[in-house]
A protein has these predicted regions:
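Bacterial Sec-dependent N-terminal signal peptides
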Residues: 1-21
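Beta-rich carbohydrate-recognition and catalytic domains
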Residues: 21-198, 208-254, 269-270, 276-320, ...
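Conserved positions at the start
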Residues: 38-40, 90-92, 146-149, 201-204, ...
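Predominantly extracellular/luminal regions of secreted and cell-surface proteins
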Residues: 170-182, 318-351, 461-497
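Surface beta-strand/loop "capping" patches
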Residues: 197-198, 311-330, 363, 508, ...
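Catalytic nucleophile loop of clan PA
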Residues: 263-265
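Aromatic, loop-rich ligand-recognition surfaces of beta-strand-rich domains
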Residues: 350-462, 494-591
Length: 591
């Protein structure tokens, strides 16, 4: 990369536009989009929800569980686990919706697997049957190394798949194929050589605009500043393509470093490029990447203008789902320690997903927020450094900074997520978060953002999911569409007409058994399930026949919904159960 050329370009841009770039550590920057280390993003909008599929980064080798981030406004994102694949070697995922109504999930670990589901979050099953069955083995197309699979759906509904890495060698390039209607085979394949896609290294992405097919890809090394996005065009999805140039590269001051492996979101007439870049300060070897987004522009002839990467991002694409004020934003803060000047305590309250408070030690480090005056607090979001790992912590509040009360005790937590959401209702001036342990040794309690709200702010909207008796016959998974995501396992219990719905293993906790177990006989005609946290029967809590463990129930918002922090079951004699079952309908909802 020619640094002089970058500086000159930056100066010319500033002179021409008067644009002042916000520094990477400014409060409230829009980039990165998500708090955490993720790479190789694919962004899609299905219905009114945005989905971000990405490689889990930060481990040194792109190692992490299957997951997806969801958002209604493109600003507030919630991490949701997915059921497949079981391996943690999951790179460059992509999901598309087919004309058959199903969703197809393409994931890579030096070969491409394909899952199918009725929803964009799964539950997924390998389209070829066996969980480890491979759709595209390595070198399926000669001289195309299999990695980074991405789909493109043409106007006529035809589906194409593109893949490749290390395409810089002579005679190498990108593999491309047109999928058959069953999505299990190809009707046509081709190598798009690096003589057409100059400098092609990896991460192909194809889109169509006004009759032009754009073949975009990444060049250089993903470990350093040379990583960039280039493109070529054609009048056919399989090419041949004509090289057009570079459209995204490292900025002049290096704070947007190694941008690449992108996807494109079309929203109305606007196009947005979502890409990863290295963290700030830069970690060793570029394995701590973060996701960003910037607006694309096109010239009259259809060529893509050079994209100027920013720390501002694009902001919200819909009305914000968060209605309450973040009391912690810009508040005074102090901590037990901080690693160095690049990881100050103030970074935990700046609403910036690219700045991090990191304590010096690995023990019970703490951070304390001073709101100035006592205020009502109902919700606290904590966005820890690694959203796919669980953290154990204690949140306390105080009016005077001397006498403390417990707001949330998660010292036995086994649930991963981002944000971690804790509810309560207290008036306090001080909030203290203490890290007490975590999933992996050597990972301290670093925090991207600590957000304190005066209202009730769930990180995802309440959603209902109908489940009839027929749905669980022969079925193993049912998604949790509520705030905490994940999936339920469905299984028959010992009694022939009973049904058990158990939460997945990541909801287990030493202190509480986070699950819903419903046993009715005979089997109910229908049951509505969304989550594992609250329940109601016919719009009210069932209090007759000792249906639930009453001593374990507590009321939460909204009214008439009750938390079920342990397994619940029907209790009483057989006649009571039978009479009860015939006239009642069970509902569970996650807030």
């Amino acid at each position: 990369m020619n640094k002089i050329r970058l500086v000159v370009a930056s100066l010319l841009l500033g002179a021409a536009t008067g644009f002042a770039q916000k520094p990477f550590n400014a409060s409230g920057t829009g980039n990165p989009i998500i708090p955490g280390y993720f790479a190789d993003p694919t962004v899609k909008k299905f219905g009114d929800t945005y989905y971000m599929y990405a490689t889990t980064d930060g481990s040194g080798a792109g190692f992490g569980p299957a997951q997806v981030w969801t958002s209604k406004d493109f600003v507030n994102w919630t991490l949701m686990p997915m059921n497949w694949p079981d391996s943690h070697w999951i790179w460059a995922p992509d999901v598309m919706k087919h004309t058959d109504g199903n969703y197809y999930y393409f994931i890579v670990s030096c070969m491409i697997h394909c899952g199918v589901s009725e929803t964009p979050r799964g539950p997924w099953k390998n389209i070829l049957g066996e969980s480890e069955a491979v759709l595209v083995p390595d070198r399926f197309v000669t001289n195309a190394i299999t990695l980074d699979g991405q789909t493109f759906v043409d106007d006529d509904g035809s589906v194409y798949l593109y893949w490749g890495t290390w395409g810089i060698y002579k005679g190498f390039g990108c593999g491309a194929g047109k999928l058959a209607s069953d999505m299990k085979s190809f009707t046509e394949t081709r190598l798009i050589p690096n003589t057409e896609a100059t400098d092609f290294f990896e991460a192909p992405f194809v889109m169509k605009r006004k009759g032009i097919y754009y073949f975009m890809y990444s060049s250089g090394s993903c470990h350093d500043h040379t990583y960039r996005v280039q493109y070529a065009t054609s009048d056919k999805p399989m090419g041949p393509y004509t090289y057009r140039g570079c459209i995204l590269e490292t900025n002049a001051d290096g704070t947007i470093h190694g941008p690449g492996h992108h996807s494109v979101l079309k929203e109305g007439n606007e196009y947005y490029m979502v890409y990863h870049r290295h963290d700030n300060p830069h970690s060793n070897r570029g394995f701590h990447r973060q996701l960003c987004v910037d607006r694309m522009e096109f010239a009259e002839d259809g060529s893509i203008k050079s994209l100027i990467p920013t720390h501002d991002g694009i902001g919200a694409l819909a009305s914000s789902v968060v209605k309450s004020k973040n009391l912690a934003l810009g508040a005074k803060v102090r901590a037990s320690s901080f690693y160095d000047a690049g990881f100050r305590p103030e970074y935990a309250v700046d609403d910036n997903n690219g700045t991090l408070w990191r304590p010096r030690g690995m023990g019970q480090e703490w951070i304390e927020v001073d709101l100035g005056v006592a205020q009502q607090i109902q919700t606290i979001w904590t966005q820890f450094e690694y959203g796919t790992q669980f953290y154990q912590y204690l949140i306390e509040t105080s009016v005077d900074g001397k006498h403390w009360s417990v707001f949330a005790d998660k010292r036995n937590n086994r649930l991963a997520g981002s944000p971690m959401v804790d509810f309560g209702k207290v008036k306090a001036r001080y909030v203290r978060l203490t890290f007490t342990g975590g999933q992996k040794n050597g990972f301290g309690g670093a925090v991207w953002n600590l957000k304190i709200f005066d209202g009730v702010e769930a990180s995802a909207p309440q959603q209902w999911l109908g489940l009839t008796a027929a749905d669980w016959n022969g079925r193993e998974w049912q998604n949790n569409e509520g705030m905490l995501g994940g999936a339920f396992t469905l299984k028959e219990v010992r009694h022939a007409h009973s049904v058990s719905v158990d939460a997945m293993r990541w909801y287990w906790n030493r202190e509480l058994h986070w699950s819903i177990v419903i046993r009715y006989s005979p089997r109910p005609k229908s049951i509505q399930l969304v989550g594992w946290f609250t329940g109601q029967v016919n719009g009210r809590v069932m209090k007759r026949g000792r249906v639930f463990h009453q001593e374990r129930l507590r009321c939460i918002v909204p009214p008439n919904l009750w938390s079920l922090p342990i397994s619940v079951t029907t209790i009483g004699n057989r006649k009571q159960r039978k009479r009860h079952t015939m006239r009642k309908r069970i509902s569970c909802v996650c807030l």
